[in-house]
Amino acid sequence: MKKEQIGFNAGKIWQKLEKDLTDTNVNKIKRELKMNSMELGTALGWLARENKITFVSDEKTFYVLPVE
């Protein structure tokens, strides 16, 4: 996967988070944006490395939230 594609996918996730924070379930983001696991993971890693997102979880589900 090219770095440009990872950055593009990170941008799609970021736009979704800016638009709608009502459901930030990682699996739902994956489905809505039609990404495979590799695409989602690398894009989330990109955003985390830039300190733009944080991860929270309950017992079964991971969520992504923008860093304030």
Predicted features along the sequence, with ranges:
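Short, cationic-aromatic polyanion-contact patches
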Residues: 2-10, 23, 57-68
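Short amphipathic alpha-helical interaction segments
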Residues: 35-46
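A short, conserved structural fragment
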Residues: 48-58
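Short loop/turn and capping residues at structural boundaries
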Residues: 28, 41, 58-59
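Short amphipathic alpha-helical interface segments
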Residues: 6-32
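Short amphipathic alpha-helical segments enriched in leucine
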Residues: 18, 45-48
